[in-house]
């Protein structure tokens, strides 16, 4: 299976700020901004939001079921995805809205209780899920926490069809007879958000034939982020043919 991005999640990066009464760290203190913020952050980080099966991911799961003979329960798709190995972490993020705390900031000295504390959260919502995601956030963050959008941009989605898709299929099969391109939703973000506003349909086509034992998803923004040379060479050949014929 070769993944082709036909959708990507929306961006909702936010700063959460809690206020409290500043004071001396040695005193009894029941109005602590750090504590209030951490409670909200812990709720966000420990809550797995409900599964939402969008059209691209339904097509992806159908392809996985057919290719690997795996029976997939639409209500519990992650149980089947776990059998796919490391890629399940990336694909699993495309089955629900997510909100991951990434940064914390509070105080300036060990013995001073700060008046404010803030956290940065990387939020991502599925296509058609923006309002529901904001409702979910409000319930988890709770009262007494201010939310400020740092980056907020739309989710996008298109269908897996048309002349470009036909050329992707042909280019892949020229290098791999058994290639089967399948659509999926990208949990990250690309320029598709901007191009979509211009009326352009966008596909993410980065053909790589990866070694089966490579935990490729773990390399994204990780230590020694890289692509195997053989995989890159394969992709160059496929993209060259695609661009010449598209």
Language-model features, listed with the residues they occupy:
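Metal-dependent amide/peptide-bond hydrolase catalytic core
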Residues: 2-234, 240, 244
